[in-house]
Design a protein with these regions (language model features):
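Secondary-structure boundary/capping micro-motif
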Residues: 1-293
Length: 293
């Protein structure tokens, strides 16, 4: 493998029960870890899975298992992780304890697209083949975020914004674009090259770079239209109000996002630039609205 095909050695982690009953009648617990792939990755990133005895579901077991995963990665030529992203709020405290013991940064974030796709694949192809499999959903997904959106922090509010779209094929070269901050993703398999990818452009003549730094820290997950508001979901459960919309704009943007979810694998983007005419980006993030989120 090529160790350069991970982004900053970030890992995405899920430690939770699976729809499989063990011999003792208890649900199987499993740790899944995957490295976050770079936008131009051409192979499956580092992955690690380990079952946990139901009586040992605690931070001590998790710490040891993540340490084992780190050793496996190093032995296989992958870089050790610096950060762990945890997407389940119910497991946040336990993962934080394990990360602290291992001197790793833990980020509570749903920017775990590679992990969620792997989880979906295991739900469809792996778990049903296991003895003790319980038909039904993999595990209850996190409850839909219901908190009212709050205005974006002042540090991320620009002078203006616009709604835009880019052909999917253009995003293949996104890693070559001049950008001070970015969060790029591999293009999903089976995506048509001319599929429009909708997104938000934010502009600020004087503060574009600072805005980009702040937005990256928010861990942007996906854009959606809620009533007549454009909302950015971020982190583990944050909802940020980007802008109020008139009825025509709300309908048009919601339609673009719906089409992307149906035909474009849920791909979206956010760009921050000094002006609409500027070619370079202060920041550029790709996001996905996928079913598990």
């Amino acid at each position: 493998m090529n160790a350069t095909q991970t982004v900053g050695a970030d890992w995405e982690l899920d430690f939770y029960s699976r729809p499989i009953l063990e011999a003792d009648g208890r649900k199987r617990w499993e740790l899944l870890v995957t490295a976050t792939p770079a936008a131009d990755a051409t192979e499956i990133p580092f992955r690690f899975s380990k079952c946990c005895p139901s009586g040992e579901v605690n931070s001590l077991w998790l710490t040891a298992a993540i340490g084992e995963a780190r050793q496996c990665a190093l032995e296989a030529g992958w870089p050790a992780p610096r950060r762990l992203r945890c997407w389940r709020s119910s497991m946040r405290t336990m993962v934080q304890r394990a990360a602290t013991e291992l001197d790793l940064e833990m980020i509570a974030s749903r920017r775990t697209y590679a992990l969620l796709e792997w989880l979906q694949q295991r739900e469809q192809e792996v778990y049903p083949q296991e003895e003790g499999f319980m038909a039904g959903p993999l595990a209850p997904p996190p409850a839909p975020v219901a908190t009212p959106p709050v205005p974006l922090p002042e540090e991320v509010q620009g002078d203006a914004w616009s709604w835009a779209s880019l052909p999917a094929d253009l995003l293949r070269d996104a890693s070559d674009w001049p950008s001070s901050f970015s969060g790029l993703l591999p293009l999903p398999a089976g995506l048509d090259s001319d599929q429009p990818v909708p997104g938000l452009r934010l502009f600020s003549n004087s503060r574009a770079l600072a805005m980009a730094g702040w937005l990256g820290g928010l861990e942007p997950v996906k854009l959606l239209v809620d009533g007549r508001q454009l909302v950015l979901e971020a982190g583990q459960d944050d909802r940020w109000l980007v802008s109020d919309l008139d009825s025509a704009a709300a309908e048009a943007i919601a339609g673009d996002l719906s089409q992307s979810k149906e035909l474009g694998k849920g791909l979206q983007f956010i760009a921050i630039q000094a002006s609409p005419e500027e070619q370079a980006f202060a920041g550029f993030w790709m996001m996905r609205d996928i079913a598990t989120l």
